[in-house]
A protein has these predicted regions:
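Alpha-helical substrate-recognition element adjacent to the catalytic core
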Residues: 2-71
Length: 71
């Protein structure tokens, strides 16, 4: 029996969305849907970004509105 849990660590700017720093670009819908599906299958998804403070909150809120949550 394997206890392996896949972990996806994804960057925000230029990966989950087009790079428009300090704003937020268009979503990478294909990747976001892939991560949502993997998470429903038990994978862990981590946001790996250099955004901090209000810019980090904006990024997390943006992802949540698109249905992507993080572990």
């Amino acid at each position: 029996m394997s206890s392996f849990v896949p972990i996806y660590a994804v960057d925000f700017d230029g990966t989950l969305c087009e790079s428009k720093w300090p704003g937020i670009g268009a979503p990478n819908k294909k990747l976001i849907q892939h991560l949502i599906q993997r998470r429903t299958e038990g994978a862990k998804v981590i946001l790996w970004t250099c955004r901090v403070e209000e810019h980090l909150k904006e990024a997390v809120d943006w992802c949540c509105k698109l249905g992507l949550e993080f572990d």
